[in-house]
């Protein structure tokens, strides 16, 4: 297959986190500020302590290094302050492997210079090191792990001839990318129409298209990889050929302008209905395009599972940006998703950053981590049978005021309500206090009114998992749910109150004299006279 050099020109990007105080991020102002020489691997920390350098914003290391040395370098950068490590020059070091997760999430590292002895970059090594603008790949490198450079600001991806393996998502979400190349002598990878393809298994690793318009996945592609379109934020449509037999997790993340996905006739594994991507028998909804037009969407009754990120960004702040007219955008925006009874699993990140309201059917038994992160839901009732609330489930949901957990709940994950600012009513129907992650309610900026089953207040008060300043008080005013529900089979559940409004439709958080409109967990509403 013919090799081409792809030049992608885009507007110079101002990084979200600038370690250089406004200076040109292509220049390394801290290069070789301090040089350390070691003669034995594993001694870098001691050499640093002996040298006592006045500055370490830029560090050049000469000599043999091992993983312990690399972890020490990460430690120097970990505070992520302006006086910490920005530039790491390893060109004169002897190193064969960059460890997995090495600089992951460290905001102030801008330049890394890798040695020619390097053979492998581990998975997530530079993931979300979002100020990183330079990390050129040396000749001799053989393997790059999954998501190794995801979410960085690197400007060039020039693959060496020696490179044999690239993990999925390695180059996803590269916001400042201007250049990609594969040398003709490298037989393992090709670039076709701005798409990087791994020849060994015909996997589409990354779509580097920055412009607007349609993407036709090449006929040679058999698999679309994890995060393959991650960051292709301007494309409006994707056409999948009949050759594709598998699609990786969250393949269409952050395709903000995407309006439709089509599948070629004759594809035995996938289908598209009105621009929405499903597996062939429509039991799995894979992707609802972020900017698909329509105020509401009813998921087909055949669907049993929502894939990872199925509705992420839909109706949210990043959708419909190509529509400038406010009235037209309002007509296009997705506000409501209706999930069918029979649905059993909602994947992680399914509604992350979405702007729509959603029901959770009584048949759901599994909900993935961060499912509703930064979404606009106002209330949520988790159905009977669900045993676990995943990490970050309701984090950054600024409008969420009422959460109802079922009697079957056994575990509450980390930071489930982090960054929320609304006083929240939490109804927990579990007779025995669920086990909580030690940070279950960490970073919650308001307070919780906890309601438990009658007679169980003392049990919750004694539980270390349910103590803390976030709880205003514990009220044991809920009626116990007696049900034969299991984790695999649906059952009828007594409806409970999930929200309350006055006659003007304004949300209220306690009964008010007069007529109150009460919304129940089964979707019904009733008017209640409060005297």
Regions found by a protein language model. Name each.
Residues 43-52, 68-78, 99-102, 124, ...:
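Short, T/G/N/S-enriched strand-turn elements that build extracellular solenoid repeat scaffolds
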Residues 462-484:
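A recurrent domain-boundary module in secreted/ectodomain proteins
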Residues 478-504:
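Residue-level detector of functionally pivotal "anchor" positions at catalytic/ligand-binding pockets or at interdomain
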């Amino acid at each position: 297959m013919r090799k081409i050099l792809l030049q992608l020109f885009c507007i110079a990007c101002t990084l979200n986190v600038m370690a250089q105080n406004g200076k040109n991020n292509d220049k390394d102002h801290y290069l070789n500020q301090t040089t350390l020489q070691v003669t034995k691997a594993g001694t870098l920390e001691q050499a640093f302590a002996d040298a006592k350098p006045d500055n370490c914003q830029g560090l050049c290391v000469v000599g043999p290094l091992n993983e312990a040395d690399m972890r020490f370098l990460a430690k120097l950068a970990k505070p992520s302050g302006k006086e910490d490590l920005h530039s790491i020059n390893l060109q004169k070091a002897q190193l064969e492997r960059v460890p997995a997760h090495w600089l992951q999430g460290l905001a102030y590292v801008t330049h890394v210079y890798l040695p020619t002895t390097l053979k492998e970059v581990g998975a997530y090594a530079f993931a979300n090191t979002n100020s990183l603008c330079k990390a050129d790949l040396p000749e001799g490198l053989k393997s790059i792990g999954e998501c190794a450079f995801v979410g960085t600001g690197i400007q060039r991806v020039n693959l060496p001839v020696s490179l044999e393996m690239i993990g999925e998502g390695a180059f996803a979400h590269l916001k400042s990318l201007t250049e990609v190349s594969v040398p003709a002598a490298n037989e393992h990878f090709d670039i076709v129409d701005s798409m990087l393809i791994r020849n060994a298994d015909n996997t589409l690793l990354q779509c580097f298209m920055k412009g607007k318009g349609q993407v036709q996945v090449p006929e040679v592609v058999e698999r679309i990889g994890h995060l393959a379109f991650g960051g292709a934020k301007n494309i409006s449509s994707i056409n999948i050929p009949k050759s594709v037999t598998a699609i990786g997790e969250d393949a269409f993340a952050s395709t903000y302008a995407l309006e439709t996905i089509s599948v070629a006739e004759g594809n035995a594994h996938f289908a598209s209905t009105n621009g929405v991507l499903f597996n062939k028998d429509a039991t799995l909804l894979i992707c609802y395009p972020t900017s698909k037009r329509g105020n509401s969407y009813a998921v087909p009754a055949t669907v049993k599972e929502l894939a990872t990120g199925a509705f992420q960004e839909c109706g949210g702040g990043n959708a419909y940006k190509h529509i400038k007219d406010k009235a037209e955008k309002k007509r296009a925006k997705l506000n409501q998703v209706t999930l069918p009874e029979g649905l059993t699993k909602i994947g992680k990140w399914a509604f992350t950053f979405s702007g729509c309201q959603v029901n959770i059917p009584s048949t759901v038994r599994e909900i993935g981590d961060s499912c509703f992160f930064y979404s606009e839901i106002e209330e949520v009732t988790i159905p009977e049978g669900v045993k676990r609330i995943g990490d970050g489930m309701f984090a950054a949901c600024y409008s969420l005021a009422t959460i109802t957990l079922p009697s079957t709940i056994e575990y509450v994950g980390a930071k489930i309500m982090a960054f929320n600012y609304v006083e929240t009513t939490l109804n927990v129907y579990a007779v025995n206090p669920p086990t909580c992650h030690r940070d279950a309610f960490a970073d919650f900026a308001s307070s919780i009114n906890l309601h438990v089953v009658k007679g169980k207040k003392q049990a919750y008060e004694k539980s270390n998992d349910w103590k803390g300043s976030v709880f205003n008080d514990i009220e044991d005013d809920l009626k116990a749910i007696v049900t034969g529900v299991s984790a695999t089979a649906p059952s009828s559940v007594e409806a409970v109150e999930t929200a309350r409004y006055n006659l003007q439709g304004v949300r209220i958080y306690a009964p008010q004299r007069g007529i109150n409109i009460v919304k129940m967990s089964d979707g019904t509403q009733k008017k209640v006279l409060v005297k």
